[in-house]
Amino acid sequence: MYKRQGHTTASTYGSKIRGAITNNTLSKGTVSDYWLGDAPLNMVTWVESHDNYINDGNWYNMTKEQVILGWAVITARKDGTPLFFDRPYYSSVENEWGMNRIGTEGDDMYKDKSVKAVNFFRTAMIGEDENIVNPNSDSTAVMIERGTKGAVIVNTKDALKTGFETNLADGTYVNRVDGKTEYTVKNGKLTSDADIPANSVVVLYNDGYKEYEAAAEVGVAEDTVFNIQSGKTATVTLTCANTDNAEYALNGAAAVSYKN
């Protein structure tokens, strides 16, 4: 019954991805092997879980930016169901707990442009086979191609020169992360006027791409402190974006409109 209803968790794979990102060694063999033997590939994948974050010390071993690079790798792939662990609000490699309190929102890292772009890429690539290569035979970067339709490039170290081979169909592509950097594919070669920056994600596809309106965002300023001592007061700066109708309410009182 469990095998029919549940999914295997690829914990070892997550460990391999963490090591690959932090050591800048995204070899094809490391990235491609799920370490599950003959188990069905309907597993859950992650870069880190809450246990990895706290008990394994990944909170100080891996920055949020590195977690996002790992997320791009596992989410661009054909198989698995990726699970994103959102770290505590205002946490860092110096402070694992951040402003962690019951009811407090987590970190905004899941809203990062790279996360958003690769999530939409995954949906657009359903049904496409995958091909994993190291561009220019450079194992500090990896390219995950999905048929001839799209590709995600994750670069962990120095700026990466283009001009490498690809299965992408000929045409012009825009990096869906920054929305502006153009890449050209002609006769099996991918080129751009710009190098691929270190510690970055490039998401390339045209077929299946959809333009969405920016979602409304509300929150508090990044330096907001929540662990206020009893009897003390604090100033809280509310933030909002992509909306003209943000509101807050205190203790059941009437809602009050505010601007960013």
Question: Which residues does each PLM region occupy?
Answer:
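Low-complexity, disordered linker/stalk regions enriched in Pro/Thr/Ser/Gly
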Residues: E211-N260
